[in-house]
Amino acid sequence: MAKVYWPYFDPEYENLSSRINPPSVSIDNTSCKECTLVKVDSMNKPGILLEVVQVLTDLDLTITKAYISSDGGWFMDVFHVTDQQGNKVTDSKTIDYIEKVLGPKGHASASQNTWPGKRVGVHSLGDHTSIEIIARDRPGLLSEVSAVLADLNINVVAAEAWTHNRRIACVLYVNDNATSRAVDDPERLSSMEEQLNNVLRGCEEQDEKFARTSLSIGSTHVDRRLHQMFFADRDYEAVTKLDDSASCGFEPKITVEHCEEKGYSVINVSCEDRPKLMFDIVCTLTDMQYIVFHATISSSGSHASQEYFIRHKDGCTLDTEGEKERVVKCLEAAIHRRVSEGWSLELCAKDRVGLLSEVTRILREHGLSVSRAGVTTVGEQAVNVFYVKDASGNPVDVKTIEALRGEIGHSMMIDFKNKVPSRKWKEEGQAGTGGGWAKTSFFFGNLLEKLLP
């Protein structure tokens, strides 16, 4: 038999450019009095801007300014960031993590795209099964879903739910309470999916969209996955009408223009500033297959201004009015999805099966609807954060809040915060430190901070 010789290809060939020109990350705390400068230089590659922004936002850092340039083969960014209290980033663990993940040994694309959810300090979710739910929103839905899981002796380790345009998207990370391992029995998974779908079918009367439950084997970043679920559900097609409490401070203005000289489409976003705004916009553009070549991000008080120079991945710009309108609607939806006005409720208790079901049941019994929710577990402690409104979508009165405190305050740590919507920046011209967006992470509220070493 004649020998056949094949050319040898080094499996690391694709990473050759990165090894020859490794990424460079520097943390500068001397150039600016008010913030920390994070400078990233690396070989350009698809999705790299989202990867970097994702790392910074997962650490609950606020991006106050940014300058992006990635035209050609090199990617050069400068981010002005502060911590949750508006101070420079001085924590050595945070700085080391940024340098490690974004630096030569970080391989950000590999580690961040496979993380099972947003980073929770040094804590991991462990072995788990991911459940994704998209359905029409209604009062008590989250309570019914969590009750089904509790009856099946399935524990919710972490979860996040958003609502927008009468729809709810939710990602839950669960495990078997008896083994603390992922639920992998086919019959049990089938039963769980069937029972959840039965709950969701009750939401879809007189609605042209379908509810669905899926068991995810992927591990996309949870915030990005929620954006993707809403985008696939075409939530941007519905007309968004904010209520009076929300509209007084949050109406984004988005324009799309053409840059003849360089052949870019230029997107300008002007809106009220809030945490993770840049992530939501960059995430949406990336998932719509647009590449950001240049960008300038700035914020002043409660106002944010962001400018992006983009092309589609096929090299085309936004030439038709239909394309421009679609991008504007999708960005508006991405901005609105994370908006939550009114009372936030933070609860901390020993983790157990049925805890989420119990808390959401109590909220429902008090006539409250959950507009946004986050659940995480630190050791044996579960931390739940809920943004609530009454069943009609109106702000919750103080009497209801006090009744909640009296009913559940004896069995778990509880903290209420009222996020008063700030006035439009052009009317106030002041920083939104009094009302506006609280300097509190969605997952890292005061209660969780007490648990961390």
UniProtKB/Swiss-Prot annotation:
Instruction: Give the SUPFAM superfamilies listed for this entry.
Output: ACT-like
Q: Name one Pfam family in it.
A: ACT
GO molecular-function annotation terms? amino acid binding
| Tissues in which the protein is found | Expressed in roots, cotyledons, rosette and cauline leaves, sepals, style, and pedicels and tips of young developing siliques.
Q: Where is the ACT domain?
A: 37-112, 130-212, 266-341, 344-423
Tell me what induces its expression: Down-regulated by abscisic acid (ABA).
User: What GO terms fall under cellular component here?
Assistant: cytosol
Name the keywords, alphabetized.
Answer: Repeat
InterPro entries named among the record's database cross-references: ACR1-12, ACT-like_dom_sf, ACT_dom
Task: Give the superkingdom in one word.
Answer: Eukaryota
- What does the UniProt record say this protein does? May bind amino acids.
Q: Cite the PANTHER family for this sequence.
A: ACT DOMAIN-CONTAINING PROTEIN ACR3, ACT DOMAIN-CONTAINING PROTEIN ACR4-RELATED
Tell me the protein's name: ACT domain-containing protein ACR3
Q: Which organism is it from?
A: Arabidopsis thaliana (Mouse-ear cress)
